[in-house]
Amino acid sequence: MAAAFLNLGGYVFVFFSSFLAIVAPQVRGNVAVFDSYWTQRQSDALKQTIGSYDPHPLNVTNHFNYHVNIAVDASESRNDTRRELTQVRSGRKTHKSSGKCLAYNPIDNCWRCDRNWANNRKKLADCVLGFGRRTTGGKDGPIYVVKDASDNDLINPKPGTLRHAVTRDGPLWIIFARSMIIKLQQELMITSDKTIDGRGARVYIMEGAGLTLQFVNNVIIHNIYVKHIVPGNGGLIRDSEAHIGLRTKSDGDGISLFGATNIWIDHVSMTRCADGMIDAIDGSTAVTISNSHFTDHQEVMLFGARDEHVIDKKMQITVAFNHFGKRLEQRMPRCRYGTIHVVNNDYTHWEMYAIGGNMNPTIISQGNRFIAPPNEEAKQITKREYTPYGEWKSWNWQSEGDYFLNGAYFVQSGKANAWSSKPKTPLPNKFTIRPKPGTMVRKLTMDAGVLGCKLGEAC
């Protein structure tokens, strides 16, 4: 996860790796020294966590499912010819051959069929649903164009590089002048109110360190590849426009959320990270992970890292419209505490289990498709870890509208709808809590992962 840092105060210090090895196990949250800058950021982040928590999660899941129903019903009425239905059945990403844009899920339906998307990029910020629905990223700031794929200066990053962009003060909407491969020398410290928007280019973050969102608020990560991420050795790294810090070795997570709030990760393709693909810990909440594609990894998502971190009871995350693909082993996600809405995802492969956790997380699984592996010992979707039945039988793990294939099965516990107070503003009865069923998932996830957006064309 996130590594450690030390304020330089304008001076340059040299620390040996042996010093870091001694300090690292003793630090709080991997922070070697809390200077006034990071103490303030941590304090602000805790306030954001508490303020971003929704005491009525059922209202959020209702809102989400309502919009899915509206979008699917509208798309079905527009696209009911035999040719178009055949295309959807035949596989993913074949819909453009008809010359029409099909966007069944409401997030994509909000923006993706606009041929003028490149001149209206910030429309994307109006489209997020789920627990991260208030995320706007850099909507209120100017466009920043990344023109240089290098990452050679970690202390004073070169203008025009991604590292320079994400460490600026204030909101920015970050786009890319061309396709590029960015090999991060050390973890990329992203500050608040940023959008990383890879549309119109092929942007690969690969064969280097990953992305870190530590004690930040309001970030969108959209339409990029994150592949072959490795641990960083740590060292002096700029973590904001006015601050440079000393970091210990990073774990090799693809995207690491540490005390991060109002985060939206959308249309990301992720493969082979040294540790987790997406980890959200230590008070991270108000997060939506959507329309993404995951392959070739052991431990995909970790939500909550330690039993003693009870702040993660405030954790609320939506996992929606994703494709969990080939050669994945477990943790899709693995949860400690919190409320996790897992909805309309396609689980086509897992080797051990799909969804697991401990410390009484609430897991609401709705309208997913689960295809179990051939191994008879791995057909159970769920796994409660380090907890006897007498304790976990009261946890609220509910399945509704899921589609089970090849012997897959979900072991439920708790009582239906006991996990939330009644909605403050109930929606029409037709849509209350009712997801689109797992049989619809192929349509809802058919464009999961990075989109090949071209100027003047629908994505």
UniProtKB/Swiss-Prot annotation:
Glycans are attached at N59, N79. It comes from the Eukaryota. Expressed in pollen, but not in leaves. Its cofactor is Ca(2+). It is an enzyme of class 4 (lyase). It catalyses: Eliminative cleavage of (1->4)-alpha-D-galacturonan to give oligosaccharides with 4-deoxy-alpha-D-galact-4-enuronosyl groups at their non-reducing ends. Ca(2+) binds at D251, D275, D279. InterPro entries: AmbAllergen, Pec_lyase, Pec_lyase_N, Pectin_lyas_fold, Pectin_lyase_fold/virulence, PEL. Its EC number is 4.2.2.2. The active site is at R331. This is Probable pectate lyase 3. The gene is AT59.
